[in-house]
Amino acid sequence: MRRICFRAWVLTQCGGFRLILFVFLTLIVSSSLFAAPQEVLTNEQSPQASTEMQHEVGNPTPLSVLIEEAKKNDPAIHVAESAARAATFAAPQMSTLPDPQFTLQQFSVGSPRPFAGYTNSDFAYIGLGASQQFPYPGKLRLRGAVADRDAGAVKAHVEVVLQDEIETLKTTYFHLAYLQQSLGILQQNAALLQQIEQQAEAHYSTGQGNQRDVLKAQLERTKILREISMHHQLVGEDQAVLKRILRRSQDSSDIIPEPLSATFLRYSASELLDKVRGQNPNVQEDAAMIQRNQMAAELAQKEFRPDFEVSYMYENTDRKFRDYYMLSFSVNFPRRKPRRAALAQAQVNIVRSQQEQDAQVQAVLAEVQKQYVTIKASEEQLLIYRDGLIPQAQATIQAGLTAYESSRTDFESLFSSYMDVLNLDLEYQQTLLDHETALAHIERLSGVTLP
């Protein structure tokens, strides 16, 4: 301060240097006024700087590698696969004869005491018998077939879970790549805004600008800091989802995605729609349920037929009497009222499952068409952004910087050009994310694999 005061005293001795003194003191005041926000910006950028170093050190992981890892490790897929394996054991249980029954019988005569009358009556005996129930021919086969169809539906559900998890993996991976690229855009524009702020300070210090321009630039820099902080939060959320799908420890190293780039769709809308019935996993699951219900209706029809039981018993008497041998054959007479209700229920279930499949198909077809329109529109928009809007905005800001530096344009025009560059860059990345997300959804709906 003594050095500054001394210099000011010397300059005041000469009337011709009064203007220089005013400019010098103005620069001191303005630098002290805006030192705190700049220091905050520097401190706030330090975590991002360390994150950038991690991104530079780590290597991006291709999406295909993560998909293969998810197929092996995803807990949700493991649960569905275990359920499918368990369902395969139902058919042998349903298609096997009922358990045989064995009987040991003792018949007393003249007294409730065991073996009473055994030696003096030919009615007293010790019997050993066995019996077996036989369902009407075809019932066991149909019961096993129904169980097989149940297992087929559970197996089809495995593919539903698999495709759902892969779609979640893809969309989260794309969103993480979007955050990574938009974060770079925010940092680049923060540097550009700092350049604009410095020029605004220079204009303000020379009396050609006003303090409002400087404060407005600093406010925008603070907003960028907020956006960067929100990006860090979203990155952490995406990392948690990816590690859950891959069954990695949540404190393991972060996954670095490859840069997001546009993949143009080579299928026509009609080709995608044609693949829905044959390749959509939800439609296939509904088809398996239709087959199951059809087989259950056949079984309900067969339940009108009676079941049979055969039993045989050997009855041993005393040596002086002859033994007894008894063969029995029995048949049940099914009550028709509950059987008719069961058959009607099975037939309604067939209609219901067919209606569910039709509703599912129509919903998928509509969603495929919707996503197809989104993809084609975003492809056009990406070209407009890449070849038109963004280059024009960049040329405008460069011309504006040059003009503002030489005081040939005002701050508002320059700031508007800067906001155009920032918003168009972010809009391009958002459109690119929407495009890739729609492609992942198309893959899930139609069953196609896109490059």
Predicted regions and their residues:
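Amphipathic alpha-helical coiled-coil segments
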Residues: 79-94, 161, 165-186, 195, ...
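A glycine-/polar-enriched beta->alpha junction
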Residues: 68-78, 85-100, 128-145, 156-163, ...
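Periplasmic alpha-helical coiled-coil/stalk elements that build and connect Gram-negative outer-membrane
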Residues: 2-3, 16-18, 46, 161-277, ...
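Small/polar, glycine/serine/threonine/aspartate-rich low-complexity segments that form flexible
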Residues: 43-60, 103-134, 143, 255-266, ...
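Acidic, low-complexity, intrinsically disordered peripheral segments
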Residues: 2-7, 11, 21, 34-55, ...
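Bacterial N-terminal signal peptides
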Residues: 18-31
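Bacterial Sec-pathway N-terminal export signals of envelope proteins
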Residues: 35-101, 106, 133-134, 250-291, ...
